[in-house]
Amino acid sequence: AALFQPGAMQAFLGQMGDAEVTQRFSQLLLSMANVSPDNIRQALVASGLFGEFFLSRQMQSRLDVKQLMRKLLVDGKLTSELKASVGQLVDEIEGHQIEGLQARQSQQISYHFVIPFSDANPVEVNFERGAAKDDGGSSDWVINLHTDAEDLGPLWLKTTVKANREIDMILWASWSDSASKAEAASNILQQSLQGFDLTLNKLTVLNAARPSIDSSLTGS
């Protein structure tokens, strides 16, 4: 995610030296001002998690983050520092691919990726769902988000979506004014979720950094 910080991104694009690659990379960036469910879906597809899957199925896919990073490692005119950052990003994507494969082998789902923005700091996203319950019912979806917003500070959000479409949310905000803003906007959030036929059952806002606890003990 460090590579997708606005300052690093400008330096990165400036050293590409390839107008076509720069344009393609820019197309992968979302706008925080116009974010929507469709662009989140597109960001997941373009995250690099599914490139090998599409190739194995002989399915056409657009250039994704991982393919572009690999291309830059071979063709790009990058400084040694940026080359190391690009290599680290590829390693992270491949690590998340392995996590997803291991989850699928256990009848679970796990997608971990980063959404880059043109007008905001990147957002780290992790979707998870456990195996089906013993009674055949669906397990809850757990969605974790993390970003360090310039105007709101570090934020962590854990959302649990139940089979009955009820939602529980926990927000950790390091800045006290950001926590206050989140509490004040709870009614707006509830109304927005209703537009997607979702019910906000509980929202907990904590003025603190999210504790680092083993996800296997907490359900992420």
Ranges and model annotations:
Residues 1-220:
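Extended non-catalytic alpha-helical interaction modules
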